[in-house]
């Protein structure tokens, strides 16, 4: 009986060893398959990944240049706005000066027109005044 159990255990041991060997073989096959798949994926994906990285770098550089260009444009626009503001101030100042000059010109024109009008304005004088003026004129010239 002991011998039978020993044979049974040896048989069982042999079966387990065979199963372990079979499992080890399967594990090795799976590892080889995994390595093969990994190598295929790496060989197929890595070039694409590198292409995508290169594209991403290119896009990043273009975005960086675009940002720099935008900053330059904003700075130039600010300068233009400052110049336009100064021009507007100068224009307003000139308009004020022009208005002042117009007022002065109008005032001068009025002042120069008024005396001219008085010179040529007909006057009404009395007969007595006319005789006095005529008399003073004749005294100067010596006529009667």
Swiss-Prot record:
Upper lineage: Archaea, Methanobacteriati, Methanobacteriota, Archaeoglobi, Archaeoglobales
Protein name: Uncharacterized protein AF_0047
Keyword Coiled coil: yes
Keyword Coiled coil in annotation: yes
Annotated coiled-coil segments of the chain: 48-119
Keywords: Coiled coil
Organism of this sequence: Archaeoglobus fulgidus (strain ATCC 49558 / DSM 4304 / JCM 9628 / NBRC 100126 / VC-16)
């Amino acid at each position: 009986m002991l011998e039978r159990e020993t044979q049974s255990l040896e048989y069982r041991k042999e079966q387990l060893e065979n199963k372990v060997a079979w499992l080890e073989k399967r594990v090795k096959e799976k590892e080889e398959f995994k390595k093969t798949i990994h190598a295929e994926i790496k060989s197929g994906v890595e070039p694409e990944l590198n292409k995508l990285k290169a594209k991403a770098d290119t896009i990043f550089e273009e975005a960086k240049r675009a940002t720099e260009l935008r900053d330059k444009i904003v700075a130039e626009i600010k300068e233009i706005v400052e110049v336009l503001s100064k021009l507007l101030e100068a224009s307003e100042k000139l308009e004020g000066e022009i208005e002042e000059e117009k007022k002065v010109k109008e005032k001068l024109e009025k002042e120069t027109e008024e005396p001219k009008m008085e010179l040529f304005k007909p006057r009404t004088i009395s007969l007595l005044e006319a005789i006095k003026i005529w008399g003073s004129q004749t005294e100067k010239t010596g006529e009667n």
